[in-house]
Amino acid sequence: MGANLTSPLPHHHRTQTTSVCNHLFSPGDGGPTFAPQRDSNTSSRSSSNAKESVLMQGWNWSKRNIQPVMSRRSLPKSGSSSEATSSKSSDSLVSFTRNVSTSTSSQYGKISISLDRNQNYKSVPRPSDTTTIIPNYYSLREEFRRGLQINTRQDLVNNNLASNDLSVIGSPKHVPRPRSVLRDDNANCDISPIAEQENVPSEASTSELLRGLGIFISNNCDVSDFDPAHLVTWLRSVDRSLLLQGWQDIAFINPANLVFIFLLVRDVLPDERHLIHTLEELHAWILSCLYVSYSYMGNEISYPLKPFLIGNDRNTFWNRCVAMVTSHSRQMLLLNSSSTFFSEVFTDLKHCSSSE
């Protein structure tokens, strides 16, 4: 009954004989091995190297298959290079890295690289050149600017040249033309010397031009009960309504805009006087001219339709406005671009106010 349970398989010499199945927990003699194919030249090796473990085969395979990354042309020619980069030596990686670093340092040795405290490359200073491809007032060279003789008192930054000089230097984009500056109410305005030679009136006010416009309408319409004071009430009421409602910040009725309204009335009213028979129709027709004037000369993008509409006939209102724009678009644009044409229209309106 005193027999011991031992495994019939061979086990390690450290294993105690009294334990059960110690061979399952003791290190074995080695993993599965395989015998690689060998050439006739390698048959003389010792039998101890005939069997190698899988781990050893994998380690030796990784060392034997190291291939150099760079070609031999880029490496420096030396007699010990073949020995240093031997694939069977354990120091092949170290020697290969040294050779690559040596060749790289020889190629980029002439480049000067500066680092800051944080080991970052310092930025290359940019060239300090003040000239640009499209020269402006700040980047023109001194000698070129001196030759142009630019007038620094003008707003040259935004190219808002409003010089009264008739030379090309004063306004390089176009030849400036004389224009009259009209001020509101009883303020006098100065006309250019060319306009004075043509005996153009040198004074204009809003009240005078309103009276002249009313007299012209009274003389060229068939409405007997129309009075020039009606025109002043119609225009002032629309202007005041838009101001109170916040549609505009400044008043629209001024001498320059009255000249624009007179241009439409002078050219359109004689042809449509046979269509206007009552004071209400004349009122609607005048407000149509005023709406077109607001669209061309107003400071805002758009305006409401209600202050300009008399009654509910919107089709007639729009047809009248479109007809005015179609037939007199050229004259309306010419009034803003040509000071001569503006002076002519202004003179006609001024004569109407003085012909009473």
Curated annotation (Swiss-Prot):
Disruption phenotype: Accumulation of presynaptic components in the dendrite of DA motor neurons. RNAi-mediated knockdown results in an abnormal distribution of GABAergic synaptic vesicles at synaptic termini of the ventral nerve cord. RNAi-mediated knockdown in combination with exposure to pentylenetetrazole, a GABA antagonist that induces seizures, results in an increased convulsion incidence as compared to wild-type animals. Its main location: cytoplasm. Residues 1-53, 66-99 are annotated as: Disordered. Keywords: Cell projection, Cytoplasm. One of its GO terms (molecular function) is protein kinase binding. Expressed in all classes of neurons in the ventral cord. One of its GO terms (cellular component) is cytoplasm. Residues 40-49, 71-92 have a biased composition (Low complexity). Pfam families: CDK5_activator (PF03261). The keyword Transferase does not apply. It is found in: Cytoplasm; Cell projection, Dendrite; Cell projection, Axon. It comes from the Eukaryota. The keyword Mitochondrion does not apply. GO terms for biological process: anterograde neuronal dense core vesicle transport; axon guidance; regulation of dense core granule transport; regulation of protein localization; regulation of synaptic vesicle transport; retrograde synaptic vesicle transport; synaptic transmission, GABAergic; synaptic vesicle transport. Heterodimer composed of a catalytic subunit cdk-5 and a regulatory subunit cdka-1. Interaction with cdka-1 is required for cdk-5 activation. Belongs to the cyclin-dependent kinase 5 activator family. This is Cyclin-dependent kinase 5 activator 1. The lineage of its organism: Eukaryota, Metazoa, Ecdysozoa, Nematoda, Chromadorea.
